[in-house]
Design a protein with these regions (language model features):
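Metal- or metallocofactor-binding catalytic centers and their adjacent structured scaffolds
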Residues: 1-21, 73, 101
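Structured core elements
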Residues: 6, 42, 60, 132-134, ...
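Hydrophobic alpha-helical packing residues
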Residues: 11, 76-83, 87, 116, ...
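Glycine/threonine-rich beta-strand-loop-alpha-helix active-site module
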Residues: 20-40
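Flexible, glycine/charged-enriched surface loops at secondary-structure junctions
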Residues: 23-26, 84-102, 122-134, 169
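Mobile "lid/hinge" segments at catalytic clefts and subdomain interfaces of large enzymes
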Residues: 33-97
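Active-site-proximal beta-alpha loop/turn segments in soluble metabolic enzymes
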Residues: 58-69, 93-109, 138-151
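Acidic, glycine-rich loop-and-beta core segments that form the ion-binding/anion-interacting portion
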Residues: 110-169
Length: 169
């Protein structure tokens, strides 16, 4: 976001000068009415941020189905603690990675996502309706010789896209 943010801001400032308005006056006209920020909460780490065998760097939950920010935040904390209990109950490590998410050894990213989805449901929330998932794959960390080396496979660009689509299902 570093360069695109600067370009976007420069564009907004230039437009504000052109129409002779302050930037804050333009934002609702361009982007619509302000709305509640949605937290992205990192709850499980892999990749360069953890000493485990998970290739994807960050697995996040996105509590979006709430009217108040504190309800969204609370739901995320509840899922985090449910995940911790589930990990402990399954004999998995509850140590945290560099970014604050748990860093147990799972055998696949799908296994991680399944565990998070079960934690959401066990916490009493509706996966996909109230809380969704997000990934920061940090794929540059496992891109070698024009291939994505993930879970022991060497994937082309198209295969990597297909892999991520499969994960999302």
């Amino acid at each position: 976001a570093n360069s695109i943010l600067a370009v976007s801001m420069a564009n907004l400032v230039a437009h504000s000068k052109l129409v002779q308005k302050y930037v804050y006056e333009l934002i609702p006209n361009i982007y619509g009415e302000p709305f509640l920020p949605v937290p992205f909460m990192n709850i499980l780490n892999g990749g360069a941020h953890a000493d485990n065998s998970v290739d994807i760097q960050e697995f996040m939950i996105v509590p979006h189905g709430f009217e108040k920010f504190d309800d969204a935040l609370r739901s995320g904390v509840e899922v985090y603690h449910t995940l911790k209990k589930r990990l402990k109950d399954n004999g998995l490590a509850t140590n945290v990675g560099d970014e604050g998410g748990f860093a147990p050894n799972f055998t696949s990213s799908k296994e991680v996502l399944d565990e998070i989805m079960m934690s959401i449901a066990e916490s009493g929330y509706k996966p996909g309706e109230q809380i969704s998932l997000a990934l920061d794959a940090a794929s540059t960390e496992f891109f070698k010789d024009d291939k994505y080396i993930i879970e022991g496979d060497a994937l082309s660009n198209t295969e990597m896209s297909d892999y991520l689509i499969d994960l999302s299902n």
